[in-house]
Amino acid sequence: MVAVLADEALYEFTGGEPPTLEQLQNRYAAQVVGGSADGAEWWLNWMVTRRDSGASVGFVQATVRAGTNGSVADDSVADLAWVISGPHQGQGLASEATGAMMLWLRSHGVTRFTAFIHPDHGASQAVARHQDFYPTDQVHDGEIRWESGQPASQ
């Protein structure tokens, strides 16, 4: 994944820089735990590979927060994110992978989804729209919160 994430253009909207091998190993070691120590969050991190070649092209991830009753699988919300390397963008891979993750999460009781997207990141906005997300008025760290479903006014 170091080579996949090496393209500096991937960080145009999110900030940061390509991770080193050591940074990526440390990140994955923390993520493989699968959730917070108190059980209030699940962490899913799926590598996206091409079906035709098996080549790694990016990832899709979810942070699932517990709902009002404290259970992750009931009344919970999943914050989603996706990254696809430059040469593989625009082919529907992020939409397909995100949709697959949402399907899996729904099968485990998650019904609400969000994503935080930079206002100028048209490609990520297209992925969100493909999943029936809509932009809200909420902004966090310069990114707009998108939510699944229909806006409250509809």
Segments from the language model and where they lie:
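GNAT-family acyltransferases
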Residues: 1-86, 104, 108, 116, ...
